[in-house]
């Protein structure tokens, strides 16, 4: 039986609130934005994963912690036990095809971020990304239990005008918001 770092991490941190982020681009930025918002709101937050702090570098946390994970397709590929109360797929574009073979396989592996969720959990998908849209079909076919929330970019221009920061002038970072 194979136990992945994600599975072991979840087993050690079942009591924490886990937010996981995957996608081809923007994972680190999105994790940092969420971390800053939650820290500003006085939550105890740790961000781990491919963002520079390996997942298993975090020891068992207390119930009052929010753990933000940046997760790659490599980590999701063999994970069977991992569960995240909030999981998001930001976008998908052709990448890592030398490992996953084709886009269909890559998309299916990315969708595994939702497989361990239950009825009280939330799944967020960028519904304006053509590859991410196909995950909605996987969601229905697999009869996944979490609440699916498709995210659209409608109205984001109003928000960006209120945030006077040159960082959000790039298309990718606007999409991350």
Cite the ranges covered by each PLM segment:
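Conserved helicase ATPase motor motifs in RecA-like P-loop NTPase domains
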Residues: 19-33
């Amino acid at each position: 039986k194979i136990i992945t770092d994600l599975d072991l991490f979840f087993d050690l941190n079942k009591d924490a609130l886990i937010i996981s982020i995957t996608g081809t681009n923007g994972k680190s930025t999105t994790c940092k934005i969420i971390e800053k918002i939650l820290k500003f709101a006085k939550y105890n937050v740790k961000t781990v994963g491919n963002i520079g702090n390996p997942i298993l570098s975090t020891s068992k946390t207390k119930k009052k912690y929010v753990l933000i994970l940046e997760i790659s397709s490599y980590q999701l590929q063999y994970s069977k036990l991992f569960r995240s109360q909030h999981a998001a797929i930001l976008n998908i574009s052709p990448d890592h095809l030398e490992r996953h073979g084709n886009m269909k396989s890559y998309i299916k592996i990315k969708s595994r971020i939702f497989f361990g969720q239950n009825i009280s959990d939330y799944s967020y998908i960028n519904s304006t990304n053509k590859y991410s849209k196909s995950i909605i079909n996987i969601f229905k076919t697999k009869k996944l239990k979490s609440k699916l929330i498709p995210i659209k970019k409608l109205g984001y221009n109003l928000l960006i005008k209120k945030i006077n920061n040159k960082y959000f002038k790039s298309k990718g970072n606007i999409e991350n918001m």
